[in-house]
Amino acid sequence: MLMQIADFEIGLNNPLFLIAGPCVIESEALVMDVAGELKSITQQLDMPFIFKASFDKANRSSHLSYRGPGIEKGLTILEKVKKTLEVPIITDVHEDTPLQEVAAVVDVLQTPAFLCRQSNFIRSVAACGKPVNIKKGQFLAPWEMKQVVAKAWATGNKKIMVCERGYSFGYNNLISDMRALAILRETACPVIFDATHSVQLPGGHGTSSGGQREFVPVLARAATAAGIAGIFMETHPDPDRALSDGPNSWPLAKMQPLLETLKELDKVVKNAGFLEQSSE
């Protein structure tokens, strides 16, 4: 299924697109700098791009952790990014988020993985009529996402993406099964792979999550080779000082070489076609 986002279309057989940005809005200056650099990189690569940042991280490990600037200031900053840099915006919403207020600013709404089974929430977000990126829960088998998508589609909104971000594998660990990407295609939705949250070690530092960012390129290449519509990566100029998800964020300075590789891989895979679709 093809989906229109701003001025480009996304889909399995279309060129790879990027969702990227810092995990959380730390400051207007940082957000503008990161968004500007990502726009420059993706323009050079002719890669469609959606900027991502959160105004409120509601599921932090500790109540003392930084959550973001809040909705009022956060939306003001995201709107400035959108208007100044002319890039589409995605941000995550929660059960107590005033959805219409957010939908009036951003181009895509994102539902957190932990909330993918909350039926009323999924329906409410989809009912806004905006494109929605539904992140698959770390506790869900890929084929179970068909039912989540069905809840969203029941509102009449067919502009739904599904995002794989790893599966719980023991304590404080996630694992990525590349077969899940092919299974998620059966939802008929564009499939996204979150290469940075997939290397997260949830709660691994006790009061915060750990991560293994050195494996981001490995999983990003594998997912692109498996066949996806888009790649999701959180990035930061100095991940070790990021206020959220630093251990699994990919350094901004290393985004371009990684994206160059992914673009070439994507081209080869999609030009060759997907043999698994005719394997039976």
Curated annotation (Swiss-Prot):
InterPro entries listed in its UniProt record: Aldolase_TIM, DAHP1/KDSA, KDO8P_synthase
Keywords, comma-separated and alphabetical: Cytoplasm, Lipopolysaccharide biosynthesis, Transferase
Location within or outside the cell: Cytoplasm
Pathway(s) of this molecule: Carbohydrate biosynthesis; 3-deoxy-D-manno-octulosonate biosynthesis; 3-deoxy-D-manno-octulosonate from D-ribulose 5-phosphate: step 2/3; Bacterial outer membrane biogenesis; lipopolysaccharide biosynthesis
UniProt catalytic activity: D-arabinose 5-phosphate + phosphoenolpyruvate + H2O = 3-deoxy-alpha-D-manno-2-octulosonate-8-phosphate + phosphate
One GO CC term on file: cytoplasm
One Pfam family linked to the record: DAHP_synth_1
GO molecular function list: 3-deoxy-8-phosphooctulonate synthase activity
Extent of the signal sequence: none
Record GO biological process: keto-3-deoxy-D-manno-octulosonic acid biosynthetic process
Superkingdom of origin: Bacteria
Family: Belongs to the KdsA family.
Protein name: 2-dehydro-3-deoxyphosphooctonate aldolase
